[in-house]
């Protein structure tokens, strides 16, 4: 981890990170984080009864548990604004909301109706304006006019699916769904699977998302703010997430180890100089401290922050290159999966920029109208 941050610091005058995802690999010392969090979230409907430590409340926006049988969101109401504009309601035609109408539940309803949550994204994805049923096309080919085509409503206690079709093309379906949602206090509950993955998610107020899988491996999607400047800000954001995450684990799992790790993490946050932060991170790695010793890069992108004032020559890019140009002028390096990957493509990027500058200078010095076609091809296509 310290070597990665050292290199990102070395190039931060030219490159800034955008997407940054990483994993914390499960290890035996930490216990069953997934199972214990699942048990706590499943049995409670108040945020305070799950997250006892009030010091970390401002950092955590929402907890989500999702499996095949149940999806449950627990929201921290204090992290949401008051929604006064009814035009912000995003989901009323997708959901039937059941609530006990208490003040707490009514506030949760207001938040649910105004926030674009993962439930809204899921139900929008499963609502299909037009879908071709190829099985029914096959019936038409082999069965003639007597083939049966389904249209109508299918429903259970929590999900109603309406299938409509055109009489002239009955194999083309329009599918709409409505989901029942039960809101009690801080909890938003629906039955059945509402996500591709079975995970526990912790959504932070800074938009960072931590996904915990059944084996307690974690996937962390680190958010990026416009005011993030350089590697030191990135380290502070990551270790701020660590600090609050580990105190949450200590809260729920009752494992003192996480409190000790949170204290070590806090030393990194308190350090003011980058060199001091990197030194502390290196020491954490040497002592096999959770969060550093089991850190594994998932994927990250870099963007070249300086303007490209010269002509861009796409012919210099390999077909499978991770160097991409956005709108012709913005250079991005995408899907980097290791420090070696990063250093390799930054070197390629630097060399390519220099080659483009040289070609651009030559191109600007010649008369395009009188120059030979072969010479122009050599500049533009090779």
UniProtKB/Swiss-Prot annotation:
Signal peptide stretch: none
Pfam families the record matches: Pox_int_trans (PF05718)
Keyword Transcription regulation: yes
Top-level division of the source organism's lineage: Viruses
Keywords: Activator, Transcription, Transcription regulation
Coiled coil: none
Family: Belongs to the poxviruses A23 family.
Function of the molecule: Acts with RNA polymerase to initiate transcription from intermediate gene promoters.
Subunit structure: Heterodimer of a 45 kDa and a 32 kDa subunit.
Name under which the protein is recorded: Intermediate transcription factor 3 large subunit
Protein's organism: Monkeypox virus (strain Zaire-96-I-16) (MPX)
